[in-house]
From Swiss-Prot:
Gene3D superfamilies in UniProt: 1.10.10.200, 3.30.70.980
GO molecular function: DNA binding
Subcellular location: Cytoplasm
HAMAP family in the record: Transcrip_reg_TACO1
Keywords of this entry: Cytoplasm, DNA-binding, Transcription, Transcription regulation
GO cellular component terms given for this protein: cytosol
Native organism: Thiobacillus denitrificans (strain ATCC 25259 / T1)
Alphabetical list of Pfam families matching this protein: TACO1_YebC_N, Transcrip_reg
Xref: InterPro entries: Integrase-like_N, TACO1_YebC-like_2nd/3rd_dom, TACO1_YebC_N, Transcrip_reg_TACO1-like, Transcrip_reg_TACO1-like_dom3, YebC-like
Protein name: Probable transcriptional regulatory protein Tbd_2215
Family of the protein in this entry: Belongs to the TACO1 family.
Example GO BP: regulation of DNA-templated transcription
Length: 243
């Protein structure tokens, strides 16, 4: 089914993230450290680490930072012990919000996340309260103008789960969230001459809710507050906000 506002929504989320570029390196270093801790320091044997390094390089994260983050993850260098944590809640009009964190103090993090919700008119929920409204997927988005037929052929041959043409001309390719499966499809598309505008393993909303006016402005404040927290890695919502 075509997603009428999918491309605009993705661009909006990326725009929010780009506006906070001062935090990008910190988030990337945390993800590399945790990936190395969980799966080992060899990118060839650790797909999550490989993807994290690739993302770091795309953001011009210095090589020394990458190498030191890996060493902290494997214990070769002393470092902070981060844990993964996910929190769920509701924004304006009951829209769904999921917040993924890497933290060394869950007590602090849960208090900060709850405060960000409540201060701006949202509320934090219990585990699982909105998770069913999202699907864990590999998501590759091609900008408007790509050939749907060529994308479909390359993606499905490489094992993609679905290819979705959107009303705005962008094309969304969905894969398994398994990093190896995701990489295989991404590489096949690149080999076919396509350059993904977005390529990530993410939580994709099953349905979206458009907000406008004051509701959109209030929702933006909730998202900004959550994304400004040091422990927050990703914020997902099914809200669609105007540009």
């Amino acid at each position: 089914m075509a997603g009428h506002s999918k491309w605009a929504n993705i661009q909006h989320r990326k725009g929010r993230q780009d506006a906070k570029r001062g935090k990008i390196f910190t988030k990337l270093i945390k993800e590399i450290t945790v990936a190395a801790k969980m799966g080992g320091g060899d990118p060839a044997m650790n797909p999550r680490l490989r993807l994290a390094i690739e993302k770091g390089k795309a953001e011009s994260l210095p090589k020394d930072n990458i190498e030191n983050a890996i060493k902290r993850g494997t214990g070769q260098l002393e470092g902070v012990n981060y844990e993964e944590a996910r929190y769920e809640g509701y924004g304006i009009g009951g829209v769904a919000v999921m917040v993924d964190c890497l933290t060394d103090n869950k007590t602090r993090t849960v208090a900060d996340v709850r405060h960000a919700f409540t201060k701006h008119g949202g509320n934090m929920g219990t585990d699982g309260c909105v998770a069913f409204q999202f699907k864990h997927v590999g998501q590759i988005v091609l900008e408007p103008g790509a050939s749907e037929e060529a994308v479909m052929e390359a993606a499905l041959d490489a094992g993609a789960d679905d290819v979705i043409p959107n009303d705005d001309g962008s094309i969304e390719v969905l894969t398994s969230p398994d990093p190896k499966a995701f990489e295989a499809v991404k590489e096949a598309l690149e080999k076919a001459g396509f350059k993904p505008a977005v390529a990530e393993i993410t939580m994709r909303p099953e349905a979206e809710t458009e907000l406008a006016g004051d509701d959109a402005a209030k929702m933006q404040k909730i998202l900004d507050a959550l994304e400004s927290l040091d422990d927050v890695q990703e914020v997902y919502t099914n809200a669609v906000l105007p540009d």
